[in-house]
Structures are given as structure tokens and as C-alpha cells.
């Protein structure tokens, strides 16, 4: 290692330690009324120009702090979905500055997201510095006064402290922190554009622990041609096999997707990746109260992955499952063999209805109770028995919005529909 590389590494370590010290300095400071008014005065600006502000913030942060690059998907910056969700968060924080309790559910989602990505306390000062300096640079000088910036500095410090403490509690309960090296042990094509990747610890002495059905892991990839490592989240697509000491994820090829195309075209058995501990609250729930209650499951496309262990576990528990599965077409539908085996084993307890949006004709298979060559619609949902069932749903955002909206119209309480969103999402 050259002296330049050593100096750079020492500088990186010193910077990380400095950020960690800053993070430890966060404490809750009650905002006075004058400071709250400064935060409220931000509302019109955030409503009209919030995305422009957060877009500039991300450009500043990602351009000056390479250590945070792995945590962000470039596609989400290009589509502005990441800036939009931050603008949404800032706006609602300002609107609720007098009482943040109404944001508790949203903040819980942030904690889950951060833990899944293994966000650390030392990242918060970076975000705070870039956010405040972006405000100072972009907002008019008569708005971004020292008092205005001080109010936002205090408000951000309060938010950071809440999130850091909440995330710390979750980290303490996890079997490991950070990313452990795992080796690709097997690759299986599940359909024309879905590939399953089996991952086992590089160190055979390292034992994986139980994961709740429905949880996901973050995988740290090193892609040739990229200047930095990059993270992606994947649901565990089977019941975790602790005996074989491995996880399974399943990756759909996305047009233009850097990571998904690498997985499909270049990933090999023996390759090494970093894997986080399982995380997420979209999990199978078992209790004395619901032991005899049926499950109603909706999956759109690759959204089937977390439902595989959820459905399997429910059937093993003796519960009935009504499964509505939507795919683009027959050749892209993954896990055909799994569906066949499950249907043959649980003939009476598993009802399977499939929807293919791109096919004019599909031969009904023995395993399928009903096939539709169209997208799921209101009439399909009206025919379902919605009384006393646990509802699980995962798929594209628009798909989930539609299904949940229609279920609510039919009398289902919104909080009864369990779902999860990957990537930036505005509730």
C-alpha cells in the first residue's frame, strides 16, 4: 500500500470517528415558540420547491461523501423518487412540529428501512450538514437567516436523536451488525427473468440464525465498472434453511438495472457478497387468536418472494390460504415447481387464482383453481370472503395501492392489510 493510500485510509478513519463523535453529541432540545415558527414558515417553501431542495441536497451529499454512496440507488435519484420522499418527510415534519406523535408510524418505517440498510449513527451528521448547507445556499437570504438555520439545526438534531436511539435498540437485538461475507453456493433460473441465488457464510463456522417468514436482507454488491459498492434489498424467498446454513434470494432482471443484470449475466457460484442480518416487519404473525383464521394473500410479479415462506408456514400451521397471484405472462411467472408441489400437498387448504396481464390465452393447469387473462379488478375482490382473515400483500406500488384501496372500500380496515414497500415510497 502506497503512502498516499495509507494517508487516505487514515483520513477516512479520522473522518468516520469525527462523524461518530458528532452523532453521540445529539440530544433532545425543546424548540421554543420562535424556533417552531421558523419551522412552520418553511411549509410554503417545502410545498412549492421541496423536491428542488432535496434534489440539490442529494447531489451535494453524494458528490462529497463517497462513504454514503452504497446506500443509494442511482435510479431513484434519476426518477426523483428519493428526493420526493425526503421532501414529503420534511414537509410533514414541519407541519407537525408541535406534536410529532402523528408521524410515529412513518418514523417507524424509517427505522425499519435504516436498520435493513445498516445505516449507522455516524451517517446522521453528514446528512445534517448537507441539508442545512443546502438550505443556506438555495433559500433566499431573508429566509435562511441564522435564526432560521439554528431552528432547523435543533429540529434535525432532535429527529436524529430519536432515530439513532430507536435504531440502536433494533441493532442490539440482531444476530450480527453490518455485512458478513457470504458465498454464492447455487444459482437457479426460476423463470425467463427470475434467478434464485443461494448464499452461505464464507466462514463455515458462522451460523445463520432464524429469520421470520417475510423478512429481507440487504446485499452489498461489488459490480465491475462501478466506483463504489452498492446495496440492494431482497426478500428471503424460502423458509430459512438453518441446517444447510444458507439464505435464498430471487432477483428479477430489470431493463437497465445495473445489479439485476449483473446477477443474471455475470454472477458465479463462489462469488462473495456482503449480507446484512434479516430485517423487516412484513412477517407472518402467529398467535392463539389467529390460529384458525385463513390467510388472503396478494402478490404482483416478484412480490411473491416474501409470500413463499409466509404461505408455507401458514399451511404447515394448518391454516387455509387463498392466494391471488398476478404476473405479466406465463413464461415470466417464477416458482412453478413450488406452486405445483404446494398445491398437490395442500389441495384443500390452498386456493390459487392467477392473473396474466399480457396473455390472450393460457391453458389452465391442474394446480390452479382459476386463471384470468387480465389484471385483477374490483369484481374479483368483491367475490372474496373478507371476513375474519389475515391479509398479506406485496407487489408493484400501483398494484398495492389499487388492491388496498378496493379492500378498504369493501370495509377492510387499512391497518389490517399487511404490506411492504421497497425503495422510496410516499404513504
UniProtKB/Swiss-Prot annotation:
UniProt domain Globin: residue ranges: 30-168
Domain FAD-binding FR-type: 177-285
Broadest EC class assigned to this enzyme: oxidoreductase
InterPro entries for the chain: Cbr1-like_FAD-bd_dom, FAD-bd_FR_type, FNR_nucleotide-bd, Globin, Globin-like_sf, Globin/Proto, OxRdtase_FAD/NAD-bd, Riboflavin_synthase-like_b-brl
Amino acids binding NADP(+): 301-306
Cell compartments where the protein resides: Cytoplasm; Nucleus
GO molecular function: FAD binding; heme binding; metal ion binding; nitric oxide dioxygenase NAD(P)H activity; oxygen binding
Main location class: cytoplasm
Catalytic site: 124 (charge relay system), 167 (charge relay system)
Protein family according to the UniProt entry: Belongs to the globin family. Two-domain flavohemoproteins subfamily.
Protein name: Flavohemoprotein
Organism of this sequence: Schizosaccharomyces pombe (strain 972 / ATCC 24843) (Fission yeast)
